[in-house]
Amino acid sequence: MRVVILGSGVVGVTSAWYLSQAGHDVTVIDRESGPAQETSAANAGQISPGYAAPWAAPGVPLKAIKWMFQRHAPLAVRLDGTPFQLKWMWQMLRNCDTRHYMENKGRMVRLAEYSRDCLKTLRAATGIEYEGRQGGTLQLFRTAQQYENATRDIAVLEDAGVPYQLLEASRLAEVEPALAEVAHKLTGGLRLPNDETGDCQLFTQRLARMAEQAGVTFRFNTPVEKLLYENDQIYGVKCADEIIKADAYVMAFGSYSTAMLKGIVDIPVYPLKGYSLTIPIVEPDGAPVSTILDETYKIAITRFDKRIRVGGMAEIVGFNTDLLQPRRETLEMVVRDLFPRGGHIEQATFWTGLRPMTPDGTPVVGRTRYKNLWLNTGHGTLGWTMACGSGQLLSDILSGRTPAIPYDDLSVARYRSDFTPTRPQRLHSAHN
């Protein structure tokens, strides 16, 4: 089958890889000059299935009001003048109760855990290298309340069979030795030993090269004007004076998916602006071993080979990509506070990207009412974590194979008022 994939970020490229491996003739189209040039370029670098959770959580509406008056707030909102933004925020608020949070987190963890398994299989099969580490992730708590609240997420981890360790402050240095100097600032942490890290852009570029060698065609520097459709199917992609035709089409344009699908399929994917710093390491012993998540500021600090990646924050501001100095100062403040000897901050590279977010935090993966149009978008801050699983899942569905995990509650159909999902199976039962 001829398949056109729109988008060459980590989600688009993994989709291309798995579809090609399934025997399809795949073409990837992107306006950029190469893969992973936008949202996948400089994300936080963490592959953290157990920490997969929606921003829409109990208490967030009240916290958002408080954050409006804080200099280093993890979330900021500025009206962009569109009704879509208001509708999206209203939908997000409706998901901020405990029932929706647990439901959304459960399916996010399900996909993320599966994705990590797919990444391991891919790594073993191809030998792909991307400065990856399998050292786990440590979420740090600065208050007793945060430590206490961790029990809510632990229930989901236990249900999914995700190994975890709840650590008191005195034990944090056992897994991250550099934290010994700042343990007095912390109340404890939640460690997920099976989590991983890695350079998402490097992974995407190398997998794209492997995919090309396997027969995938990449059409870079090719802006897409619109999808052409008639009745219940897509019949082409208009790119300038050219119409590119295929048997099936996959939308993986991230935050730009919503506009490209206007009038075709209504999907609630909105750009969530985030920032990162990439810092050269000065003293390896003063840098993190793997990934640290600061629960207070919602910032991740990740170790690559000779660099530290500091990323996080969320701005609901539309498609604005201005680099704001106060956001850089927040990233610098957190990394200096936790790893004062780790990196040469003055030589850091400052970056911003737009994460494609749904109101419930769960990506949109699967078929649409158009028989040859498929979606793989809306992964928010977890595109790197969920990319391989989403790509394999999409390939299985499109190819008519039975996927390894339940998936109907990942489709766009879940936003219909009459949608009733099949109850997902329990993944595992063991934990430590």
From Swiss-Prot:
Gene Ontology BP annotations: D-alanine catabolic process
Keywords assigned: FAD, Flavoprotein, Oxidoreductase
Catalysed conversion reaction: a D-alpha-amino acid + A + H2O = a 2-oxocarboxylate + AH2 + NH4(+)
Organism per entry: Salmonella schwarzengrund (strain CVM19633)
UniProt family annotation: Belongs to the DadA oxidoreductase family.
Protein's name in the database: D-amino acid dehydrogenase
Binding site for FAD: 3-17
Highest rank taxon of the organism: Bacteria
Protein role: Oxidative deamination of D-amino acids.
GO cellular component terms, semicolon-separated: cytoplasm; plasma membrane
Keyword Oxidoreductase: yes
Cofactor(s) the record lists: FAD
Pathway: Amino-acid degradation; D-alanine degradation; NH(3) and pyruvate from D-alanine: step 1/1
A single GO molecular function term of this UniProt record: D-amino-acid dehydrogenase activity
A Pfam family assignment: DAO
